[in-house]
């Protein structure tokens, strides 16, 4: 069984910095530590409200990341233009609401097909690999395929939030079927949102998944154990699930 990759999201290093308006901690420094510990890529989300990652972070990390930058953005002219200037390896298009604590659901590709297809083409023409953050629904997966985006990131939030065994099993099966279908129509499948050290293995065990993007759990663990160990422990759990 092939290995699975880990993209470490360092947004919440920036959250800690912005809480006091200081110049530290620096997400670029955190990205370097995460890479040294085995991260296969670094994910950052430049939100329209700039609540954590700032424009400067994006430009600095575009020059300092040694693995791959995955830039999450809303489908807006401002964000697409920033992506075109920065030229990260990957752009993941995500839904965004200013009042949300974190991304609450998947992108409605089926309902915004023309707009998302246009953004995907613009980014792809610039040599950027495009991923769409969507729920594991067949209609959304078909729409994602129609945009020409080569990647999807399956939203695992409902699974992560489930509290009963029945609900967990139901959400896990929903994701499993979505992942298999996405792979069957030629999409490269990533996954993420709400994954942590106690729920990651069943997702990582799905052999069709190429990469998991995980942030909050790793940064939270880093506050206790240090970032190097937090990344290594997550990567170990993921690889154990593939053994």
UniProtKB/Swiss-Prot annotation:
<keyword id="KW-0808">Transferase</keyword>
<dbReference type="GO" id="GO:0005829">
    <property type="term" value="C:cytosol"/>
</dbReference>
<feature type="binding site">
    <location>
        <position position="9"/>
    </location>
    <ligand>
        <name>3-amino-2-oxopropyl phosphate</name>
    </ligand>
</feature>
<dbReference type="InterPro" id="IPR004569">
    <property type="entry name" value="PyrdxlP_synth_PdxJ"/>
</dbReference>
<dbReference type="InterPro" id="IPR013785">
    <property type="entry name" value="Aldolase_TIM"/>
</dbReference>
<feature type="binding site">
    <location>
        <begin position="215"/>
        <end position="216"/>
    </location>
    <ligand>
        <name>3-amino-2-oxopropyl phosphate</name>
    </ligand>
</feature>
<feature type="active site" description="Proton acceptor">
    <location>
        <position position="72"/>
    </location>
</feature>
<feature type="active site" description="Proton donor">
    <location>
        <position position="193"/>
    </location>
</feature>
<feature type="binding site">
    <location>
        <position position="52"/>
    </location>
    <ligand>
        <name>1-deoxy-D-xylulose 5-phosphate</name>
    </ligand>
</feature>
<dbReference type="GO" id="GO:0033856">
    <property type="term" value="F:pyridoxine 5'-phosphate synthase activity"/>
</dbReference>
<feature type="binding site">
    <location>
        <begin position="11"/>
        <end position="12"/>
    </location>
    <ligand>
        <name>1-deoxy-D-xylulose 5-phosphate</name>
    </ligand>
</feature>
<protein>
    <recommendedName>
        <fullName>Pyridoxine 5'-phosphate synthase</fullName>
        <ecNumber>2.6.99.2</ecNumber>
    </recommendedName>
</protein>
<feature type="binding site">
    <location>
        <position position="194"/>
    </location>
    <ligand>
        <name>3-amino-2-oxopropyl phosphate</name>
    </ligand>
</feature>
<dbReference type="InterPro" id="IPR036130">
    <property type="entry name" value="Pyridoxine-5'_phos_synth"/>
</dbReference>
<feature type="binding site">
    <location>
        <position position="102"/>
    </location>
    <ligand>
        <name>1-deoxy-D-xylulose 5-phosphate</name>
    </ligand>
</feature>
<comment type="pathway">
    <text>Cofactor biosynthesis; pyridoxine 5'-phosphate biosynthesis; pyridoxine 5'-phosphate from D-erythrose 4-phosphate: step 5/5.</text>
</comment>
<feature type="active site" description="Proton acceptor">
    <location>
        <position position="45"/>
    </location>
</feature>
<keyword id="KW-0664">Pyridoxine biosynthesis</keyword>
<comment type="similarity">
    <text>Belongs to the PNP synthase family.</text>
</comment>
<feature type="binding site">
    <location>
        <position position="47"/>
    </location>
    <ligand>
        <name>1-deoxy-D-xylulose 5-phosphate</name>
    </ligand>
</feature>
<dbReference type="Pfam" id="PF03740">
    <property type="entry name" value="PdxJ"/>
</dbReference>
<dbReference type="GO" id="GO:0008615">
    <property type="term" value="P:pyridoxine biosynthetic process"/>
</dbReference>
<keyword id="KW-0963">Cytoplasm</keyword>
<comment type="subunit">
    <text>Homooctamer; tetramer of dimers.</text>
</comment>
<feature type="site" description="Transition state stabilizer">
    <location>
        <position position="153"/>
    </location>
</feature>
<comment type="function">
    <text>Catalyzes the complicated ring closure reaction between the two acyclic compounds 1-deoxy-D-xylulose-5-phosphate (DXP) and 3-amino-2-oxopropyl phosphate (1-amino-acetone-3-phosphate or AAP) to form pyridoxine 5'-phosphate (PNP) and inorganic phosphate.</text>
</comment>
<feature type="binding site">
    <location>
        <position position="20"/>
    </location>
    <ligand>
        <name>3-amino-2-oxopropyl phosphate</name>
    </ligand>
</feature>
